[in-house]
């Protein structure tokens, strides 16, 4: 059994997790396209599904209408002003997130498809760059991040479905289903952002691996210990590989910047809505625990919400740190030729790396890094302390 586990390819498992997650997003009506294999060369292609897209949009519009009609009166009847305010924030965030998905699917459909096609084309180009045959997605880091994300998705779906067993009538069941459809569907934008940044990190990682192993070996093969001339044919081959590596690196930065610009605002809006929902859920579990028969399950949802933010931040950090790895390889220091064009090429490439460095700055306000995790955790601990003090002062704890 252990020997079989050792033979399992982690990149292949990562690709399987992505395959399952893609179909999960299609069920929730967020992913309205299909990714399949071309019969001629087995490459992945994107196929648009217009009828399925309009069906998903209709379901989301019905869900938004149902939440406004059935959930808003319930929120208006809440007596506690603090809880009513939080529930209003949660309901507003859910509706805004649903509308945000509709806008993305209607107004930015072509841009999304072009971006996904660019990602698939880049992966094919990077695989052709290396002589090593790669199957799957990413490496060990990408696998473990995807595994934790998949566990979060499964727990999220399980927790939401468990809410349906204790509803009194069919109207409550319908309203709850619509609310669940909106909430889980809106969270898929965060998951798509996570996968997108992780894809950028995987692309950078593969190109860095090619430069560190194969390209460096080819550059060393051109060194002449006695200062002899380098063969033109051999130099031309290495120059072609270097040009292709530089071109791929520039293309990854361009596609990553396009992805960030396209999903920057939706991810930020839905992330803020998720934070509101987490604060409300933690408040109710602490102050009104009698409403929940499964308190441990509810605290699991709170932890899962923390994990979503942390995993998204780690994916961004992985992409940013991988984009800076090329400068640390010091490939420009190989004394292979005295041609000025060769050294000028590397100087221009390194200058572009500094100028077009891949960075993630939501709305230009701050740069996403691991410090965001500490800031988020410290703010949530402060909020928990405030809620506990409020419960003690009002004799609810």
Curated annotation (Swiss-Prot):
GO MF annotation: an example: taste receptor activity
Pfam families: 7tm_7
Membrane topology, Extracellular segments: 34-87, 163-179, 288-295, 393-397
Transmembrane segments: 13-33, 88-108, 142-162, 180-200, 267-287, 296-316, 372-392
Disulphide bond pairs: none
Sequence ranges on the Cytoplasmic membrane side: 1-12, 109-141, 201-266, 317-371
Chief location: membrane
InterPro entries: 7TM_chemorcpt
Keywords associated with the record: Cell membrane, Membrane, Receptor, Transducer, Transmembrane, Transmembrane helix
Record GO cellular component, one term: axon
Domain of life: Eukaryota
Tissue specificity note: In larvae, is expressed in neurons of the posterior pharyngeal sense organ.
GO biological process: chemosensory behavior; male courtship behavior; monoatomic ion transmembrane transport; sensory perception of taste; signal transduction
Localization in the cell: Cell membrane
Family under the similarity heading: Belongs to the insect chemoreceptor superfamily. Gustatory receptor (GR) family. Gr93a subfamily.
Protein task: Probable gustatory receptor which mediates acceptance or avoidance behavior, depending on its substrates.
Name of protein: Putative gustatory receptor 93c
Species in which this protein is naturally found: Drosophila melanogaster (Fruit fly)
């Amino acid at each position: 059994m252990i020997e079989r586990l050792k033979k399992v390819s982690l990149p292949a498992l990562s690709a399987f997790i992505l395959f399952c997650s893609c179909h999960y997003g299609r069920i929730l009506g967020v992913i309205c396209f299909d990714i399949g294999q071309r019969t001629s060369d087995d490459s992945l292609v994107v196929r648009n599904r217009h009828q399925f897209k309009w069906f998903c949009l209709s379901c989301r519009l019905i869900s938004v209408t149902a939440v406004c009609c059935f959930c808003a009166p319930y929120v208006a009847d809440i007596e506690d002003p603090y809880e009513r305010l939080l529930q209003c924030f949660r309901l507003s965030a859910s509706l805004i997130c649903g509308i945000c998905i509709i806008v993305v699917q209607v107004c930015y459909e072509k841009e999304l498809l072009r971006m996904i096609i660019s990602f698939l084309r880049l992966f094919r180009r990077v695989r052709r760059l290396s002589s090593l045959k790669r199957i799957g997605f990413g490496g060990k880091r990408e696998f473990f991040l995807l595994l934790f994300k998949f566990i979060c998705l499964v727990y999220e779906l399980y927790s939401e479905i468990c809410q349906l067993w204790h509803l009194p009538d069919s109207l409550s069941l319908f309203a709850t289903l619509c609310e669940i459809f909106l909430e889980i569907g809106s969270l898929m934008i965060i998951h798509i952002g996570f996968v997108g940044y992780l894809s950028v990190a995987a692309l950078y990682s593969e190109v860095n691996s090619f430069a560190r192993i194969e390209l460096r070996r080819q550059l060393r093969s051109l060194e002449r210990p006695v200062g002899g001339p380098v063969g033109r044919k051999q130099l031309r081959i290495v120059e072609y590989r270097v040009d292709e590596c530089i071109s791929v690196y520039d293309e990854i930065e361009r596609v990553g910047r396009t992805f960030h610009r396209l999903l920057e605002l939706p991810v930020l809006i839905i992330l803020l809505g998720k934070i509101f929902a987490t604060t409300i859920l933690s408040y109710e579990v602490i102050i009104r625990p009698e409403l929940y028969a499964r308190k441990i399950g509810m605290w699991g949802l709170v932890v899962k919400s923390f994990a979503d933010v942390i995993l998204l931040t780690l994916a961004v950090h992985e992409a940013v740190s991988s984009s800076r790895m090329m400068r640390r390889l010091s490939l420009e220091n190989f004394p292979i030729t005295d041609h000025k064009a060769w050294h000028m090429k590397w100087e221009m490439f390194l200058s572009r790396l500094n100028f077009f460095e891949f960075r993630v700055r939501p709305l230009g306000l701050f740069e996403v890094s691991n410090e965001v995790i500490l800031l988020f955790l410290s703010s949530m601990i402060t909020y928990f302390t405030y809620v506990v003090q409020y419960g003690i002062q009002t004799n609810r704890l």
